[in-house]
Each structure stands twice: as structure tokens, then as C-alpha cells.
From Swiss-Prot:
Gene3D superfamilies (UniProt xref): Trypsin-like serine proteases
Classification lineage: Eukaryota, Metazoa, Spiralia, Lophotrochozoa, Mollusca
Protein name per its UniProtKB record: Chymotrypsin-like serine proteinase
Protein task: Specificity similar to chymotrypsin.
Record GO cellular component, one term: extracellular region
Membership in a protein family: Belongs to the peptidase S1 family.
Top-level taxon of the source organism: Eukaryota
An annotated GO BP: proteolysis
Chief place where the protein resides: secreted
């Protein structure tokens, strides 16, 4: 089967049943304060702000997201943290404009598998981590014992072409070896898995539109950044993430 590999923020061609896209299907509601590092990357349109991707706080003033989420000037973005519900004000929300951002120098949106799909965002205002609603994730150089199940957190759609859920979603997924992941994607043009990727899979559960850039964690250890998956959000293919431990040294220089 041949398919066009795409990372999508908003829309897909209706006729392409096997295109590639990032976001969460088959998840459940997260509790308040359960994932305090989860953020929303938003873009301004007129006087309003709209969620386009996830992000993850790793210091009080820096966050990570997927490089493919960023194409405009830094001033067109803001980050929101402490947001459990997208359409409600819970009183725990904190927002900051973006001073600057840096995509990985070897990111290539035209290459198969979208290698090096990671970016650093610098916040204008540091986040207040005195409450349980907002706080940075722990990021270690290796994945420790995170070899089986991990939590994926998302603010994207719960089904392709459905509306975004109001509540932050989570899903428990199984980690695959990269060899197994590559085999499951065989036959899909452009679906290349490399050492800078980590894959998770659970039948009927998947990333979906709007989840790009969001975190994959084991406990409070950041392991992956949502990069790409199947656009139908069917849960029939693995979801592919940027393996953050592969980029530890680069991020520390930013």
C-alpha cells in the first residue's frame, strides 16, 4: 500500500485513507494535577488563541514540542499550562508568550520519517510551580525501566474529524522495539523509523489531530515527543515519537 506521509496540524485530504498524522483515540480523562508538565501550544488568529499542538515543560521557563508544529514567528505563539479543560476556566491556568524557539538543526520535514522532530521553546514568563497544577517533567538521559507501558497525554481529537475533547486525555500504551515498529509500518511509503524514534502501540488506541508535540512519559520521566502516526486515528498502526534521550545534549545547549 502506498501512502503520503504527512504530519498534520489541522486537516487532511478526505480521499487519503492511509496518510500519516499525529493525536489520542481510546483514552480517558486525566485528573487535575496528574500531568502538570502538559502544555498547549497556541497560535493567534485575530484576537483569539487556538490550540494547535501539545508541548511539555522541562524547566520553569523552557518547553519542548515537535519542530513540525512551528513555522511562524515566535510572537505569534503562546503556551498554556495547568489547563485540565480546554473550554473551561479552572483557575489553575498559566500563560506565557514565546520569546524565541529553536528547531533542531537537522530537522527535515521533507525527509521520510521526519527525523529530529524536536524544538525548544523559550517562555517570556517563568511558570509558577508552587501549586500541583504546573510543574516540569523529569528528563533523564536514558529511559531507565520504562520499557513496557507508558502514558501518552493529549489535547487533540478523540477521533479523526471529531471535535477536540474538553478534558485532557491520557492513554496507557505498550512500547515497541524499533524493529517491530518498522515491520508494522512496512508498505507505507515514507513511514521510516530510525534510532531517534520511539514507538508505542495498543490496538484501538492512537494519537490524533492536535496531539503533535505532546509528551510520552513513564511516571514523571519524559521519554518522547509526539511526531507522527496514521491519519485515520484507527489505532491499527503504532504512534511514533521523537526519542528525547537521543537529543539530551542538544537540548542542554539551548
Amino acid at each position: 500500500m502506498n501512502a503520503l506521509l504527512n504530519i498534520l496540524l489541522c486537516t487532511l485530504a478526505a480521499t487519503a485513507l492511509a496518510e500519516i498524522s499525529p493525536n489520542i483515540v481510546g483514552g480517558s480523562n486525566a485528573a487535575a494535577g496528574e500531568f502538570p508538565w502538559q502544555g498547549s501550544l497556541q497560535v493567534r488568529s485575530g484576537t483569539s488563541w487556538f490550540h494547535i499542538c501539545g508541548c511539555v515543560l522541562y524547566t520553569t521557563s523552557k518547553a519542548l514540542t515537535a519542530a513540525h508544529c512551528l513555522s511562524n514567528s515566535a510572537s505569534s505563539y503562546r503556551l498554556g499550562f495547568g489547563m485540565l479543560r480546554m473550554n473551561n476556566v479552572d483557575g489553575t491556568e498559566q500563560y506565557s508568550s514565546v520569546t524565541s524557539y529553536t528547531n533542531h538543526p537537522n530537522y527535515n520535514g521533507n525527509a521520510a520519517g521526519y527525523p529530529n522532530d524536536i524544538a525548544v521553546l523559550r517562555l517570556t514568563s517563568s511558570m509558577d510551580t508552587s501549586s500541583s497544577a504546573v510543574g516540569p517533567s523529569v528528563w533523564l538521559l536514558v529511559e531507565r525501566l520504562c520499557r513496557t507501558n507508558m502514558y501518552d497525554q493529549r489535547m487533540g481529537k478523540t477521533q479523526w474529524r471529531w471535535q477536540h475533547p474538553n478534558n485532557l486525555q491520557k492513554v496507557d500504551m505498550t512500547v515497541l522495539t524499533n524493529s517491530d515498529c518498522s515491520s508494522r509500518w512496512s508498505g507505507i511509503s515514507g513511514a521510516t523509523v530510525n534510532s531517534g524514534h520511539i514507538c508505542i502501540f495498543e490496538s484501538g488506541r492512537s494519537a490524533c489531530s492536535g496531539d503533535s508535540g505532546g509528551p510520552l512519559v513513564c511516571g514523571n520521566t519524559l521519554t518522547g515527543i509526539t511526531s507522527w502516526g496514521i491519519s485515520s486515528c484507527s489505532g491499527s498502526y503504532p504512534s511514533v515519537y521523537t526519542r528525547v534521550s537521543s537529543f539530551y545534549n542538544w537540548v542542554q545547549t539551548q
